[in-house]
Every structure is written in C-alpha cells, then in structure tokens.
Amino acid sequence: MAAAAELKLLEKSLGLRPGNKYSAQGERQIPVLQTNNGPSLTGLATIATHLVKQASKEHLLGSTAEEKALVQQWLEYRITQVDGHSSKEDTHTLLKDLNSYLEDKVYLAGYNITLADILLYYGLHRFIVDLTVQEKEKYLNVSRWFCHIQHYPDIRQHLSSVVFIKNRLYANSH
C-alpha cells in the first residue's frame, strides 16, 4: 500500500477531515504533505506524527519518555525494515524477529496502542494477508498482535480482514 493511502487511513482513524494533499518524491516514493500554513512535510513518520498532533491524540506517541522513544524506534523500523522489502525471505526474517519481540507484549511500545502499532499494522497488512494458516501459526505472536490491532475501531477500515483460527492445528508449530 502506498504511503499516501496509509496516511489517508490514519487521518480517518484519527477523526481528521480529509483534504490533505499528498504527493510522493524520489525513486522510493517518499510521501510529502503540502500544508496550508507552512513548509511541506516529508516522510511517513514525520507526517504521521504531525497528523496525531493535529488530531490532539498525543497519547498515541507514548506517555513516558521511554514509550516515546520506543514509538520512534518502531516508526524507524517500519521505514527501514518493512518498506521496500518484498522477497519472501526478507518477509520471513522480519516476521521471525517481530514474533520474538512480541512474545511477552500486547503492543509494540508500552501498555496501550500507539502510532507504531497502527503504522506497522498498515505496513505488514500486505504480507499477513498472504500468509498460509501454517505460517500464521509459525508467527503466533505476530498473528495475535495483528488480529488485536485490526479489531480496533477505525483502524482496518476498507482493508481486508485477515482471518486467524482460534484453535491451533499443530501442537509444536514453533
């Protein structure tokens, strides 16, 4: 999914009125937001953070200094590790690492949903939707997290719902 489409989904989930004008620059199609009253903003994380502040939902950026740093870390991870990776091998490495991280966590940063969860959900959707039942079981922690995030009101919107089975097929899928 193109970054502009993700930013429009984010706008809607934040309750902002549509109307921002997005474009993309360069070979990597880096998103650009043309603001009405200032310079244009460049980059997915920068624009998304701006939208969160514009919607007065700063809690999505983390509530403590550590959570804020973790949110930024995961936004960087989204841009450097998720975007641009399309090979099956890259995807499985990414999911394996994320699965380990989420082993004892409900959210990426802290005890509540953050912008990091939302943008990583949008970034991973294209991969998760194509996973087999066996692959979803292999990445059980990612599947649990993804299923949880997709059921938040206004997050999934028009994206296809990914079905996860409740009973495991294999006892030792790890």
From Swiss-Prot:
InterPro entries: AIMP3/p18_C, Arc1-like_N, EEF1E1, Glutathione-S-Trfase_C-like, Glutathione-S-Trfase_C_sf. GO terms for cellular component: aminoacyl-tRNA synthetase multienzyme complex; cytoplasm; nucleus. It comes from the Eukaryota. GO terms for biological process: negative regulation of cell population proliferation; positive regulation of apoptotic process; positive regulation of DNA damage response, signal transduction by p53 class mediator; translation. The modification N-acetylalanine is found at A2. Residues 2-56 are annotated as: N-terminal. The keyword Acetylation applies. The keyword Coiled coil applies. Residues 64-152 are annotated as: C-terminal. Residues 57-63 are annotated as: Linker. Residues 153-169 form a coiled coil. Residues 50-173 form the GST C-terminal domain. It is found in: Cytoplasm; Nucleus. Keywords: Acetylation, Coiled coil, Cytoplasm, Nucleus, Protein biosynthesis. Signal peptide: none annotated. Pfam families: Arc1p_N_like (PF21972). The modification N6-acetyllysine is found at K138. PANTHER family: EUKARYOTIC TRANSLATION ELONGATION FACTOR 1 EPSILON-1 (PTHR44490:SF1). Part of a multisubunit complex that groups tRNA ligases for Arg (RARS1), Asp (DARS1), Gln (QARS1), Ile (IARS1), Leu (LARS1), Lys (KARS1), Met (MARS1) the bifunctional ligase for Glu and Pro (EPRS1) and the auxiliary subunits AIMP1/p43, AIMP2/p38 and EEF1E1/p18. Can interact simultaneously with MARS1 and EPRS1. Forms a linear complex that contains MARS1, EEF1E1, EPRS1 and AIMP2 that is at the core of the multisubunit complex. Interacts with ATM and ATR. Positive modulator of ATM response to DNA damage. This is Eukaryotic translation elongation factor 1 epsilon-1. The gene is EEF1E1.
